[in-house]
């Protein structure tokens, strides 16, 4: 359990822990936090600015945070990586050259050994494995997703090819800017999140966003993104290849070899045909126009359970 406080626009999290001198005595991961601080301070005395650069670089590119709705790099993982590689630029170069399942082991706990044999597989599912320098049984980067790992590789390469201050500045998702850039086929939704703990709210927003993205696949989603001000506003956007679906679609039924199921399918659907060993029906599309499709989609019960309200919808 932990407590969240807000004081003069700052968010504080108060987490009770037990005092320990060895990680083996910890009851949970937060008990080890003071040991993390000791290790980081010992190994990064001349690297504070490099750590700040790494954290801001990741923040600006939406890669910072191990929360479930972000699945990025925690501050501690970035500190370990900077300490291990020696500078911000060396860290980026190392990231670019890393393969999936790369292991970073600053204390050489597993030198000459196979980490994938030594540790439980459940701890090694992330694309980058960072052995916690104060707890050799832990992968500090376990929360990292493949998507965020690959994104860091991309932006690191872009930055090193052409260093620019813009890489350290957060880009606001703006309807005006997106509309100016895309010109058409844009869906921009403004929502009010539910209240609660940050990680819970963020995860609900992510689920809402992924739900909409899945449903819009029919219109061929080209680009997408979302943002949240951690207060009362979240925005989702999708750029699509088309604004309208055909009035009639081919809906797949069971394979022809499933005779009973095919018979039931024919009984339920009037206009059927066979193709590639399967039966299909021709169904009328209820909402072929993008705008009507989106407005109907926003009425879905699943979406209403994930957000407090939809404030505005723009389809251009």
Predicted regions and their residues:
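Short beta-strand element of the conserved SAM-dependent methyltransferase core
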Residues: 3-5, 189, 238-240
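Conserved catalytic core of two-metal-ion nucleotidyltransferases
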Residues: 1-25, 216, 223, 227-232
